Regions:
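Catalytic center-proximal scaffold of phosphoryl-transfer enzymes
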Residues: 1-157
Length: 157
């Protein structure tokens, strides 16, 4: 046999290595997570490069709706992203350089949502759908005491 079967779906991922190894048609990296990472990194470093990156990520999210992107505009966004990622960062903070290296490895997965109209730019909808279950799992052992129950009530409100 030898050949792997590609499944006909696009996985929206948080960049975990196991997720990126999933056998699927392609991946879309969650841009909400990348934007959040850019915000945090900019607060720590004040990097202008990170601000450019955040701006283009936001544009990709905005343009990821099927009716709002034309081929020429999409190609322009992809070209600008490549230019940003390929900039030399000789005087940048080490964490900024690390982010750049990580993004270069997955750059094809950043703009998938511009090519496939049904693919969302972020996976927050999945995370929201499991939030209540996960929250209950985290605090369920505390419900045996009055203090635990009160803490749970505060968290849920």
């Amino acid at each position: 046999m030898g050949a792997e079967i590609k499944h006909k779906f696009v996985l929206v991922t948080d960049r975990y290595p196991a997720q990126l190894k999933t056998n699927c048609m392609t991946h879309q990296v969650c841009l909400a997570h990348l934007i959040r990472e850019c915000v945090n990194l900019n607060e720590k470093t004040g990097s202008a490069w990170v601000l450019k990156l955040k701006k283009i990520f936001k544009e990709i999210v905005k343009r990821s709706k099927p009716e709002s992107i034309k081929i020429k505009a999409r190609d322009n966004i992809v070209k600008r992203l490549d230019q940003i990622l390929n900039q030399a960062l000789t005087k940048s903070h080490e964490k900024v350089k690390t982010l750049r290296v990580k993004l270069l490895k997955i750059k094809d997965y950043i703009t998938t949502c511009l090519y496939y109209p049904d693919v969302p730019a972020e996976n927050n909808f999945c995370e929201r759908s499991i939030r209540n279950v996960k929250l209950k799992l985290k605090v369920s052992t505390n419900l045996r005491s009055m203090q635990g129950a009160e803490s749970y009530a505060i968290i849920r409100s």
